Amino acid sequence: MAQTNGEMEHSKESPEQITNGNNQEVVQEDDGAGGLFQISVKLPHEPYKIQVMVSSQEQVQDVRQSIVELPGTFQYTCFHLEFNGKRINDFVELSEVPGLQADSEIVLVEDPYTEKDARMHVVRLRELLGAAGDRVDTINGVNAGLSLHDSIAAEAGSEKSEKEHSLAKYDIPGSSSLKTILPRSEAPAPKTVKSISLSPWNPPPHHLRQKGHLLYLQVTTNEGEQFQITSHVSGFFVNKCSNSRFDPFPKTIPKKGSAHSLLNLISQLSPSFDAAFKELQESNNQKDLLTTFPFQNSIPSSPWLVAPPASNSLQTTKELPRETVQDRVFRERLTSKLFADYNEAAARGAVLVARGEVAPLNPTEAQDAQIFVYNNIFYSFGADGVGTFASEGGDEAARVAVGKDVLGIKAVNQLDINGLFTPGTIVVDYMGKRIVGQSIVPGIFKQREPGEHQIDYGGVEGKDVVATHPDFVPVFEKLSKALRIKKHPVWDKDNQRHDLEGSVETKGLLGTDGRKYVLDLYRVTPLDVAWNEEEDGDAYPHRMSVLRLELVESYWRAKMSQYVKAEVERRRAAKAEEAAKKEKSSEDTESKEEGSEEKSEEALDQERVDISGFSLALNPDVFSGQIPQTDEEKEQWAQDEKEVRDACDFLRSKVMPELIQDLHDGDVGFPMDGQSLSQLLHKRGINIRYLGKLATLAKEKGSRLEALSTLLVQEMVVRAFKHITNKYLRNVPAPFAASCVAHLLNCLLGADVNATPRAEIDSSLREIYPEGDFSFEKVTPEALRAEIEKQVTLRYRFNLESQWFNSLRHLQLLRDIAIKLGLQLAARDFVFTKAQAEGLKVLPVANGVNGTGQDEGSKKKKKNKNGDSGSPARSAAAEKPIVTFTPDDIVNIVPLVKDASPRSSLAEEALEAGRISLMQNQKQLGQELILESLSLHEQIYGILHPEVAKLYHQLSMLYYQTDEKDAAVELARKAVIVTERTLGVDSADTILSYLNLSLFEHASGNTKVALAYIKHAMDLWKIIFGSNHPDSITTMNNAAVMLQHLKQYSDSRKWFEASLSVCESLFGKQSINTATILFQLAQALALDQDSKAAVGKMRDAYNIFLSQLGPEDRNTKEAETWLEQLTQNAVSIAKHAKDIQARRLRRINMGTRTTLGTQIQPQVGQSTADVSAPSQASNSSIDSRNIDELLKFIEGGDTSSSRTKQKKRAAASNPKLRGSKKSSA
């Protein structure tokens, strides 16, 4: 996007003052590279001229967008640009505009409005002026795209005292308030107008439309005056209408009553408008721009907790040229935008379908078999309405199949195979229903000639009829090669053989537009035969349990590695006799290379091995009912089956145990919630159905993986509850969805408060829905627990413990349930246990979602104690039993969207090239490529996108490592905001982004701000996981070190102690991790003037290092040195204190009791040296000099001994550094 120097004061200066005189030279030098240069834009109104920084590769529409968003040119929305008197096409690049160069002047010319333009202008101004109000959005829900970054930073900046910091009085083991993830209350923005709305006289009659009337508006200014305004093709003017008289023609008023922009017209009508609008802009500028930036190419995150209350275009992009980099940028940018637009439109339509607001095309069919077309998008239910999946598991199989189909289409879109097209596809889960939305493939509804199949390639009617078409072979061959699919035979119902490139379930359709479409990609990988054959007890709900694409890729890499090693061994054996000396020399060379380049010998051999002879592909149709006919076919089929079995065995014997071991050893980041756990499993190629097996493996590892075991069990319970809730929600009338969810949540999470909850249903409303399914009313806590246990056993083959519901982490479970069902709950302190419910005699929230029900209840109780009998309504409310959730707590249910949008391959290629260059020590080239990747990410995705957040995060770490701290902080800040808005204010990624930002802020000298970020991250951690997360050890250590930097030694000590407590519980008291923290804690205790405790902790650290690492290890030696020094100082201080105590006793005998105990113990911020200052010279050999040296020793000050300096350097760097690394385990 074009860059502007949009400050108002700049635009008032002359162009000569602003323009860089060297720009012309820069343009000439960088012409080929699309260098930046500056042009002027002449405006019809103030400020009459602005300067815009542009690139020759940008399009004119980018310049347009910059003008629309610039504060000084807000009023322009309907205009075109001219250069040398000729209109410029918005969609050409600036380099294609004849004669345009640095310092050229283009002219903005206002255009006549259409009704669309007028409406867009009014909507834009309502948003700019803060008069838009809250729009009900069925897709994004309440507070979608929320960011808390600015309020966290503001809280840190509000600490006035030097000794104030965010972690003061922080309760480390305590619970976190739910307010942590709610938007902070803000002062209301300055009001510019009271209202802008459509007039009751709108729309204009036909005869006035012919005269150019577009809309009639009604504006009420801050002064209280009401104006009726006509939107005309020429602009806006005040008309003669009143509330009772229609006369939409211009009114003669003292002031000028017309303008091309509504903004300018309001400015003329309201004397206070300009000042109020300027104040509003200043208020908005206090926020980070990213927190208010509109979403373009991604769906914003909808928080689970809120404050109480087009087909052809998708295919056309694939046919765009891709020869040059600019072609690819334009193509991927357009693809990203079109997918985002399609996904949003499809999701909105899916919600309407789920709500029953779209008429079906086949209303006489059963509900699950009904199909819909809305907004040119084809919708159906993810259920087996016509019996297609009858043998695979019916509705369960159909639901899984459509989810797998989206993943398959996404993989094909990512491969971007020339000549192969996919329909735009989206799956939406909403109110228990799964809806599939697809762009209509041209020809899919076409009636074929007799004898012709509806499908041109693949299975036509299940597997009974198989079609082949030579045109599909080349494109399917490319697809199969990329996805490791083996070409194989299948047989139809007549046992006729057909050779297919893909699964028989994958279909090819030749569209009437001449394009080749691939459909039904839910079986691009083989069935997990090991899982299907392992059934004991009730059968798994469906037979769609396939392997993940990530696992197939991992298996391929493992087999390739085996092939390379075998090839190397074969070569060595062949050459061993004839070239022993040469081989020895070669091995010597290899060993040198191994030392210098840190590469394994196998990797070097691998570089020399030609892997073109290696091939591995899996047959996706084995174990799915195919019957080979000849002996040769049977033999080949048996080999295919063996290969698939080996892949399944690879998952169970290699991948899953490796993951558990990596988590045990701390080699991977520990998951925090269900979302991060699922991402970790999917990345490794592990299906969610293996949660039970993983839980068993984790339990075998003991207490170190107790947190993982808890998380795995919680995830199984949440997913079982989701399936149960969806079953009830599916047929519940929409007005009762909140009652259904609240009742089921009460049965799961509120049974301790009320063992017999009853569903809250409006009986008069219920009568309107005689066919509604209200079976959820009959659910009891006991029945729900039994059903959850059954579902966990059925789906995950894991048996929950008998009292599993007593060990639930209620808030974390509620959060995961809300996220998986799309619930948005009213924020309040939910009552989960009897202890919390004690004293509550009334319903916690009786009248709404304000989150103040408990406070109101307590006030009512106080009044009753004082003799106030209360109203009859209040008495009735008091008789209601206490329940944890009421229907009013369910503020909204948002749709959960699974899309098939591809990532940008160009941006990822640039990023990967940059990383490789940096690894090769080509720093300048690497940074240029990474910055290019950043530019591509922002151009293609827009700024607000999860992929851009990920890149900001990676780049911030890169800049931090290269010691460019300011850039690191800026990018980390952007990463936080974009992550909050796209993934959620309390997502695991948001926590990691805040922790990163805190480290960078501390490194930049902003330690107080860093502590505010750590405090917020710790609060988020408590909400999404609870206390004692394994990765929190490092965070608490970092907080302690930062507090030491602020000389807050007492607080620092508390955080080290908290870190030690978590570490001991996870790794045991004799682990090296524990010893490292003990080492740091001993230093902190010395700084806090607790010499005796410091000696004890250092001795513990030394003993652990000695037993675990031996006496010669560097850690052991350093701990021993510190122990000697601390012991020496502790003895001196104790001796000193004993002498002072003796003098104090003598004073007591002489009757001077006033000083007893008042100055012996050091106060906060006071050293022992201060206390012992009155001592006599006779004590000089044991005075406070040693403790001062110790303080300097720990803090890095100078001492007289060079030996002490060496010890100091080693201790100040190595143990802490190693400690932070190990503790992160």
UniProtKB/Swiss-Prot annotation:
Which GO terms fall under molecular function for this chain's record?
mRNA binding
User: What range(s) does the Clu domain occupy?
Assistant: 281-532
| Ranges: TPR repeats | 949-982, 991-1024, 1033-1066
Q: Which CDD domains match?
A: CLU-central
According to the record, the residues making up region (Disordered) are: 1-22, 577-605, 846-878, 1153-1225
Where found, per UniProt?
Cytoplasm
Q: Does the keyword Glycosyltransferase apply?
A: no
Would the keyword Ribonucleoprotein turn up in this protein's UniProt record?
no
The UniProt entry's GO biological process terms, in alphabetical order, are:
intracellular distribution of mitochondria; mitochondrion organization
Name the UniProt key words of this record, in alphabetical order: Cytoplasm, Repeat, TPR repeat
Compositional bias (Polar residues) spans?
1153-1184
**Gene3D superfamilies, A to Z:** Tetratricopeptide repeat domain
Extract one GO cellular component term from the record.
Answer: cytoplasm
Family assignment from sequence similarity: Belongs to the CLU family.
Query: Could you describe the subunit structure of this protein?
Result: May associate with the eukaryotic translation initiation factor 3 (eIF-3) complex.
Described function: mRNA-binding protein involved in proper cytoplasmic distribution of mitochondria.
What name does this protein carry? Clustered mitochondria protein homolog
Q: What organism does this protein naturally occur in? A: Emericella nidulans (strain FGSC A4 / ATCC 38163 / CBS 112.46 / NRRL 194 / M139) (Aspergillus nidulans)
